[in-house]
Amino acid sequence: MSEVIIHEDENFERALKRFKKKCEKAGILSDLRKHRHYEKPSERRKRKMNAAVRKNRRTRHG
């Protein structure tokens, strides 16, 4: 669980920005999106294979 302590001279928007940054770094939101629905093992393999193909294309052309 990400936790942010708000300092006396810090405003709420700044603390919220730090909290969002910590959550993003910890991978909480991406993990939540990934586990929102059940994914069959065959679908998971297909998704990973497509991601590898895209990554391979990017490295060859870029």
Swiss-Prot record:
Which residue ranges are recorded for the region named Disordered? 38-62
Q: Does DNA-binding show up as a keyword for this record?
A: no
GO CC field: ribonucleoprotein complex; ribosome
The GO molecular function terms of this record are: structural constituent of ribosome
Q: Name one GO biological process term.
A: translation
The organism sits in which domain of life?
Bacteria
Q: Which UniProt keywords apply?
A: Ribonucleoprotein, Ribosomal protein
Q: Which family does it belong to?
A: Belongs to the bacterial ribosomal protein bS21 family.
The name this protein goes by in its record: Small ribosomal subunit protein bS21
What organism does this protein naturally occur in? Gemmatimonas aurantiaca (strain DSM 14586 / JCM 11422 / NBRC 100505 / T-27)
Biological classification of the source? Bacteria, Pseudomonadati, Gemmatimonadota, Gemmatimonadia, Gemmatimonadales
Q: Which gene encodes it?
A: rpsU
